[in-house]
Amino acid sequence: MRTEPPVPTKALEAIRAALGPGAESVDAPILQPLGLLLDLAGEAMRARLFVVQAEGGAELCLRPDFTVAVARRHLDGGAASGRYFYEGPAFRAAPGTERPEEFVQMGVEAFAPPSGDGAAADAEIAGLAWRAATAGGRSDLSLWLGDVGLFAAFIESLGLPATLSARLKRVAGRPRLLQAELARAGHVAAPAANQGQLAALLAGRSEGDTAALLEEVWALAGIEPVGGRGPAEIAARLVRRAEAAAAPALGQPEAQAIAAFMAISEPAAAGLARVRGLAGGKAKALTAALAVWDARLTDLARSVPADRMRFAPALGHAFDYYDGLTFEVRSEALGPDRPVAVGGRYDGLLARLGGGPGRAVGCMVRPWRAFAGGEA
C-alpha cells in the first residue's frame, strides 16, 4: 500500500489550528461496514475500497473517509447538536496510478437541529475549509461551489411530469444516468408492459406496497433472506426501475436547458445569474434557493476573496449522501481530480443512518496536498 510522505509539523499545526477550535476531537474505527458505504456511494466504489472479511463474518473495509463514522458516533450519543474534529489516516485503492492509498485527513463535522440556519453554517464551514487549506502555504487555490438541492429546484422550474421530475432529481449525483436521460430526449416512452413483466406489475405502486408484496412472495415460497439487501431496499430499487420504464422522455428544449445548467462553471455571481437565465416558468422554489445562495455568497465573502470563488452547480463527490451545498478547494497545480479540501451539506444522511431530522455539514482537508512543498 502506497503511503503519503509525512507533512512537516509546522504545516500540520497551522491546518489543525484553523479547523479545531470549538470542536470536540474524536476518532473513528478504521474498519467500517462495507455494505453501508456501498449503499451510500454505489457498487462502483468497491474497486476503491480495501475490503476485509473474517471467515463467516460480515464484509468490512478500511475507512475511506471519516464523515459516515463521525455521523454515526454523533447519532449514538443522542445529542441534538455537536461539532467534531478528526485527524487520522484514510484508505482508498488507486490501481494503475502512483497516488498514495493511505493518506492523512483532517476535518470538521457539525450537526444541529433542523431549525438551524443552514446557509450561515454552510458559509462558515466552507470558509473554514478555505482557511485550513490556505494555511498549508499554497497560493494557487480556488473555492469551487455547487449545490445538489439547486438542481432539484431547477428541475421543478421546468414544469416536467411528476414521474420524470422525480427520476431526474434522483440521478442528479450520477452523471452516467443523467446523461442517459438527456440522450433519450424527444423519444416516445415505451409502455411499461414492453419493459418486462416486473416493471408492468410494479408501475404505480408505492415502495411500501412493493416491499409488502416481496415479503408475501418470499413467505409463500419459503424463502428466508440471509444478509444482503432487505425487502424495503429491494422494493425501492424495483419501483425506481418501473418508474424509469414508464416515465416520459424529456423534450429537447428541457434537455438543452438541463445540459446548460450542468455545464455552468463561472465566477460565483455570474454563475448564479446564468442559472436565473435558464430557469423555466415555474421558478418559485428556484427563486427561493437562489436567494439563499445570495446570502451564502455574502457570508463567504468575509473569508474568501470573490475572485477565488467559482460556481459549478453540478459539482459532486464520490459519496452521494450530499443533498445541498457541495464545495472543493482546488489547486491549479494539482487540478480538479486532486482537491485540497472537500465538503458539503448532508442532512439526509442522518435519516439514512437511522436518526431523526437534523442539519449536518462538514469539510475535509488533505494536509499533504495543502502543504506548499507537498503533492505536486
Regions found by a protein language model. Name each.
Residues A28-A47, G146-E156, L315-G324:
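Beta-rich nucleic-acid/ligand-interaction surfaces
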Residues E4-V26, I30-P33, D65-G78, Y84-R138, ...:
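Positively charged, Gly/Ser-enriched RNA/tRNA-binding surfaces
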Residues M1-T9, G56, L60:
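Short, N-terminal intrinsically disordered low-complexity segments that are rich in Pro/Gly
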